[in-house]
Amino acid sequence: MTKQPHLGLLTCIAAFAAIVTIPPDVAHAQDSLKIFISVDMEGIGGIGTGRMTSSSGKDYALGRELMTAEVNTVVAAVFEHGPADVLVNDSHGDMQNLLHTQLDPRVQYIQGNLKPLGMVQGLDDSFDAAIFIGYHARAGT
């Protein structure tokens, strides 16, 4: 996988912000945090054209690598904070974009678009934090 060190800083800041806003009593009352991550593609660092986000695009393979690398950067930041249970939900297009064989093995992964709750499938009130990666503004705005 291509290393993208310039992507890591902003992604880590976002993940850290999500983690540090967890109330201390919650963070210390349990052995590990439960973190939900939903990842879209158009807002991923390095994604610049539709050719990188469409499965028929000539640069889609690179887009998938960038998406997977950004998720792994966030996951690494979560685990630097301490033990965690992390659920990652692929939320772009047909929801089968992340390179699951390259995802951090400590995560659980949901893929495929047959999910009743789509982009938030798996999220419930048992999670301590939700992190949304790669999301974008509405088309045409």
Predicted regions and their residues:
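Short beta-strand segments
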Residues: 38-39, 89-90, 130-135
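N-terminal glycine-rich anion-binding loops that anchor highly charged ligand groups
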Residues: 36-48, 52, 63, 67
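Internal, conserved structured core segments that host functional sites
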Residues: 120-141
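Bacterial N-terminal signal peptides
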Residues: 8-24
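N-terminal secretory signal peptides that target proteins for export/translocation
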Residues: 1-6
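Boundary at the C-terminal end of the N-terminal hydrophobic targeting segment
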Residues: 27-30
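Alpha/propeptide regions of enzymes that mature by internal proteolysis
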Residues: 58-90, 94-98, 106-108
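A glycine-rich helix N-cap at a beta->alpha junction
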Residues: 105-124
